[in-house]
């Protein structure tokens, strides 16, 4: 009986304890849930990592709580690399989305919180300018591993549900650095 119980626990742990696609153990959250709309609809759940990037996670939680991420487009989506969103200043649907990727929020830019974690499939990082201390509201979700980003960008979480939705996001033009025409978007973002 004990062996059966151990086998069941190991089986349960193998299926439920790791983030979808990233191979990173799920933590206690908080979780950022993105309701996605556009050419693909569904839910993406990101396990945020306050132990890795406390200031960045706090800023994401605050912005989601204000509704700032609602109606923000996935403005830059590069097949095999990543999908970027979160420009709450210029990335709102119906606005000047051609400027998406250049804005932030009313909150201050954040100092880098680099870690020894790796950018693998499903990992979520903060977008920034060439200044490592310029991350604000924008973030990206990895389609595949990108070791050249390790230690250069702040990791804030990993996808634990809905990676198939991320995979189906409308891709951008590679010649235009992944800029997406008529992009998919975040209908509503919540944190639990």
Please identify what each model-predicted range represents.
Residues 1-4:
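Positively charged n-region of N-terminal signal peptides that target proteins for export
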Residues 6-13:
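Bacterial N-terminal signal peptides
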Residues 16-192:
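Cyclophilin-like peptidyl-prolyl cis-trans isomerases
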């Amino acid at each position: 009986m004990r062996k059966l119980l151990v086998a069941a626990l190991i089986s349960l742990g193998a299926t439920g304890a790791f983030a979808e696609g990233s191979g990173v153990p799920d933590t206690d959250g908080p979780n950022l849930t993105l309701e996605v709309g556009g050419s693909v609809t569904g839910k993406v759940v990101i396990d945020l990592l306050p132990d890795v990037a406390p200031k960045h996670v706090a800023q994401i939680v605050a912005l989601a709580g204000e509704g700032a991420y609602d109606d923000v487009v996935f403005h830059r989506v590069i097949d095999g690399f990543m999908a970027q969103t979160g420009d709450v200043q210029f990335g709102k649907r119906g606005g000047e989305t051609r400027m998406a990727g250049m804005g932030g929020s009313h909150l201050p830019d954040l100092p880098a919180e680099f870690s020894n974690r790796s950018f693998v499939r499903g990992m979520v990082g903060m977008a920034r300018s060439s200044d490592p201390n310029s991350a604000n509201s924008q973030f990206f979700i990895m389609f595949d591993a990108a070791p050249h980003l390790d230690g250069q960008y702040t990791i804030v979480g990993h996808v634990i549900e809905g990676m198939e939705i991320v995979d189906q996001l409308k891709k951008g033009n590679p010649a235009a650095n992944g800029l997406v025409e008529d992009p998919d978007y975040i209908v509503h973002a919540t944190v639990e």
